[in-house]
Amino acid sequence: MSNGYEDHMDDVCRDDIGRTNLIVNYLPQNMTQDELRSLFSSIGEVESAKLIRDKVAGFEMRSSSLSKGHSLGYGFVNYLNAKDAERAINTLNGLRLQSKTIKVSFARPSSESIKDANLYISGLPRTMTQKDVEDMFLPFGHIINSRVLVDQATGLSRGVAFIRFDKRSEAEEAIASFNGHKPPGSSEPITVKFAANPNQNKNVALLSQICHSPARRFGGPVHHQAQRFRFSPMGVDHMSSISSVNVASSATSGWCIFVYNLGQDADEGILWQMFGPFGAVTNVKVIRDFNTNKCKGFGFVTMTNYEEAAMAIASLNGYRLGDKTLQVSFKTSKSHK
């Protein structure tokens, strides 16, 4: 999954600024840029702090700190003193913030060697944790970011992970060594390959394989009651203030997902809680009847990352919400508007 690392380094990390610039991963979604600066200022004088936000326009939130876009869960902090930067890594790396454990490491200027270093791994044993996966791939190089996809209801692994290496060459070595390899505790070989680029046309075929394969890797639709979801009043309040939703599916505006067969009482909060665990969600919209203000049975969700959107579709298509079985797919021109 792309965390935008190489896309933002030109802005944040021009030329060689020494060992003062840090990248901070796994930040809580609701953490603000001011809070990021405040946290790292406790170690030493911070020259700049930047929380990376989604570039998708077309919506506004009530909080001014979120008005420029939804946080992508990572940022950069640049210290005036290299010793403070090193001390921040030693002190704050592994710090638990809300439900996240942040990762703090040195950032590097953008170059071709660090682009396209993101791996997609499937077929992992369900018992493997994020740490297990990182330990497995760590011998190949420095890991910038990693994520194991889990079932949002049970918290159990889905056997799928993404790992972003520091360099493409490290990712290539991992593919050469582990693609088709059987890890301990597994009777089946795992698949290790470069994560799909949202700009590539072949993603359409990839999505078809993920979502329409007769033998779905996740064992078919998962049936849970709507009450299993936990709601965040703050999250619902933010999402209710969205004035418009861009439903175009593209690499620049995000990937729009069509959700059909929602109940009359469905609201934006349900969509937010359902799709949020799969990745960065920028927009949600429940289509309502003008007279009754009840849901008309469908809505839209926009996610920034293709792999995360595809995984959400593969997992939630056929999901039973209350007494309804959802139909979830990428929005096409023939979808409801």
UniProtKB/Swiss-Prot annotation:
Subunit annotation: Interacts (via RRM3) with cirbp. Unable to form oligomers. Part of a ribonucleoprotein (RNP) complex, at least composed of elavl1/elrA and/or elavl2/elrB, igf2bp3/vg1RBP, ddx6/Xp54, ybx2/frgy2, lsm14b/rap55b and, in a subset of RNP complexes, stau1/staufen.
Keywords associated with the record: Cytoplasm, Developmental protein, Gastrulation, Repeat, RNA-binding
Keyword Metal-binding: no
GO cellular component: cell cortex; cytoplasm; nucleus; ribonucleoprotein complex
Signal peptide (UniProt feature, chain positions): none
Tissues where this protein is expressed: Ubiquitously expressed in adults.
Localization of this protein: Cytoplasm; Cytoplasm, Cell cortex
Domain RRM: residue ranges: 20-109, 117-197, 255-333
Record PANTHER family: EUKARYOTIC TRANSLATION INITIATION FACTOR 3 SUBUNIT G
Protein name: ELAV-like protein 1-A
Coiled-coil regions, chain positions: none
GO molecular function, one term: poly(U) RNA binding
Protein purpose: RNA-binding protein that binds to the 3'-UTR region of mRNAs and increases their stability. Involved in embryonic stem cells (ESCs) differentiation: preferentially binds mRNAs that are not methylated by N6-methyladenosine (m6A), stabilizing them, promoting ESCs differentiation. Binds to poly-U elements and AU-rich elements (AREs) in the 3'-UTR of target mRNAs. May be involved in cytoplasmic mRNA polyadenylation. Acts cooperatively with cribp to stabilize AU-rich sequence (ARE)-containing mRNAs. May play a role during gastrulation. Required for the vegetal localization of vg1 mRNA.
Record-stated family: Belongs to the RRM elav family.
PROSITE patterns, per database record: RRM
TM region(s), chain numbering: none
Record-linked InterPro entries: ELAD_HU_SF, Hud_Sxl_RNA, HuR_RRM2, Nucleotide-bd_a/b_plait_sf, RBD_domain_sf, RRM_dom
GO biological process, one term: gastrulation
Record's keyword annotation contains 4Fe-4S: no
Organism: Xenopus laevis (African clawed frog)
